[in-house]
Amino acid sequence: MAIPNRKVVITAYGPPSTALQFVTEDLPPPPKDHVQVKILYAGFAGADVNMRLGVYPMQSAPPFTPGYCFAGRVSVNGPGSGKFEPGTLVTALTKYDSDAEYINIPEKYLLAIPDGVDPKVAAALPVDWSTAYGMVHRAAKVSEGQRVFIHGISGAVGQAVMYLSLLQGATVYGTASERNHAALKEAGAHPYLYTNKDWIAAMKDLGGVHAVFDALGFESFDESYSILTPKERSVVVAYGNNLSNLTGAKRRSPWIPMAKLLFKNLYFWSNKGAIFYFITRDQKTFEPELQLLLNMTRDGIITPPIKAVWEFDDIKEAHEAWCKGSGMGSPVIRIARDA
């Protein structure tokens, strides 16, 4: 039997007030090998903001429902599905469709949330922490004694990169708003203001860093490359083009700066390199790494901070508040009133 499903739809690119609309449509029963899940919390990331603006790489055209990931409870199993009993808490990466009360999703993409893990914390793991884990452990291969620099160190992915790099024994530097510096220092990082460029000279005086994690893009890529150490293997790990979100500048195409950065890999004589990092749920590393993060959360090895919990009805305000306000961690959207 079909059920009514309230969801957000991006009807056109633009500001939250006009781009985001609530609609209610019938959701059919889950098809073969699918599971219907009642969504409790949806993750909220820069990708959602950039999709609303129409600048996310290779995104769908409107109309579509945003929401990159979720934590929820199994409602109904479709034919051929039975791995999860109804009522089981699960999480998944979806890219679309998580800003909705219910979702039909292939069973193979669901992971059970371990006992003791808060669902809203689990909702932050598939995007923010999975991205960070892959960048730290596979893209940059951060190890003990290395120096790491993170743009936006107090942001959702930035703080995850910080904690995971500290666990590896690295020394962590990065840019952040001054209001977050005390918390970052307490966590073990060395923050700099993002409103000036003092960090460039400071990192060069240290002999450069082994890894830079850059979600800003454009001119920031050149600055990041300039602070890499030339003496050992070092890398810029680029994972976004969010500079305009911070500065309010006119939107530009990110493709030329991205190509320019990756072109530097042709300098075969150099120890410096560059990677543009992204995740998909079909990568063979995605499921085991997300499972590891769920287990690390359960075991208290990591404690992913939640910056804000927005009510579903207030999702437009969540978009307006992106990159604003104090605090560290991942914002999430409470979809279910009884979550």
UniProtKB/Swiss-Prot annotation:
GO terms for cellular component: mitochondrion. One of its GO terms (molecular function) is oxidoreductase activity. SMART domains: PKS_ER. PANTHER family: QUINONE OXIDOREDUCTASE-LIKE PROTEIN 2, SHORT-CHAIN DEHYDROGENASE/REDUCTASE. Coiled coil: none annotated. Gene3D superfamilies: Medium-chain alcohol dehydrogenases, catalytic domain, NAD(P)-binding Rossmann-like Domain. Induction: During mycoparasitism. SUPFAM superfamilies: GroES-like (SSF50129), NAD(P)-binding Rossmann-fold domains (SSF51735). This is Protein indc11. It comes from the Eukaryota.
